[in-house]
């Protein structure tokens, strides 16, 4: 029986999601597990250059795993053919995997899965299984989209997200540092999550986002950073639509991150597991350690990008002075 009356709850927002016709799930990693169930996939070929949350989830689900390296252009170093039943998992690092490249791998291997965690605004291609993570681009507690033509025959419970909002609301009203440990605890709790339908809360919040404004702001900020760092940045990357971050390579990235944090410029490390386990000579170790994801998202304006440049160059100057 529907409740009527009493105190008011969060309003139903009147906008539209960017992806209205995809499967809505709780997390990117669980979207992958759900897809593997739908496809009957028993084995994945994963990049070494990958966060351990995906790896742990796949192992826990009993999926066999093999790994491949990437070169300095982030090109997968994979065999010419795959074993029967194996799916190639392609990560779109910083939005650099073009549609043409995806279609090349689809034609060559057939069984591919594309991870668009870094490329929310790159639309899926027909017949290509594609996964998106919502919380990497927006202030959300969870949420993922799955594009697939596989039949969703497996029933799922719906997720509940209200208890995961504390660090988001806390940073909005106060600051990031006060809620950093809460954010980590929240992320850690995802390890126990199974595939579920996206929560009503997350779906509702996704309806309240002005996506065209987000794209425009991210691209303006990216270009502003490129004016400061483009000549110094050795990475041959192109700006994707609505970029995730501005990836800036600096050969002492681990030390530089520590210095920038002291002046409240927080540059996350996305692949700590790679730094811990890869060989120091590998591309994976080099990029996980030394690519600095400079923030260019919709929270900021060009003047904020000026501040990013000022703080980063001050930290570089300080670091190079200590040589």
Where does each model-flagged region fall?
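PLP-dependent aminotransferase-like
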Residues: 4-22, 30-107, 111, 119
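Short, conserved charged micro-motifs
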Residues: 78-81, 252-259, 300-306
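Active-site PLP attachment segment
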Residues: 127-169
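Active-site C-terminal subdomain of aminotransferase-like
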Residues: 151-201
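Conserved PLP cofactor-binding pocket of PLP-dependent enzymes
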Residues: 170, 237-244, 248-249, 253-291, ...
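Conserved glycine-rich beta-strand-loop-beta hairpin in the small C-terminal domain of fold type I
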Residues: 197-226, 235-249
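Proline-centric
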Residues: 291-303
């Amino acid at each position: 029986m529907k409740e009527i009356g009493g105190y008011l709850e969060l309003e139903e927002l009147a906008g539209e999601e960017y992806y209205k016709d995809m499967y809505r799930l709780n997390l990117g990693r669980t979207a992958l597990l759900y897809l593997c169930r739908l496809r009957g996939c028993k084995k994945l070929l994963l990049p070494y250059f990958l966060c351990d949350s995906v790896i742990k989830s796949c192992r826990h689900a009993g999926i066999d795993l093999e790994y491949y390296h990437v070169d300095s252009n982030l090109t997968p170093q994979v065999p010419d053919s795959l074993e029967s039943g194996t799916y190639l998992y392609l990560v779109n690092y910083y939005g650099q995997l073009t549609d043409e490249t995806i279609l090349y791998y689809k034609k060559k291997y057939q069984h591919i899965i594309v991870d668009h965690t870094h490329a929310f605004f790159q639309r899926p291609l027909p017949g290509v299984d594609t996964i998106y993570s919502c919380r990497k681009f927006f202030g959300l507690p969870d949420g993922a989209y799955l594009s697939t033509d596989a039949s969703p025959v497996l029933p799922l419970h719906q997720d509940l997200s209200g208890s995961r909002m504390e660090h988001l609301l806390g940073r909005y009203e106060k600051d990031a540092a006060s809620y950093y440990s809460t954010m980590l605890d929240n992320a850690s709790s995802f390890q126990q999550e199974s595939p579920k339908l996206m929560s009503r809360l997350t779906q509702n919040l996704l309806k309240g986002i002005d996506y065209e404004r987000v794209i425009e702001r991210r691209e303006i900020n990216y270009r502003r950073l490129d004016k400061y760092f483009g000549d110094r940045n050795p990475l041959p990357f192109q700006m994707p639509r609505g970029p995730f971050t501005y990836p800036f390579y600096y050969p002492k990235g681990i030390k530089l991150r520590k210095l920038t944090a002291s002046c409240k410029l927080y540059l996350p490390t996305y692949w700590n597991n790679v730094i811990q386990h890869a060989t120091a000579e590998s591309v994976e170790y080099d990029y996980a350690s030394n690519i600095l994801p400079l923030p260019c998202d919709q929270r900021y304006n060009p003047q904020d990008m000026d501040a990013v440049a000022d703080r980063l160059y001050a930290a570089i100057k300080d670091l190079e002075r200590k040589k």
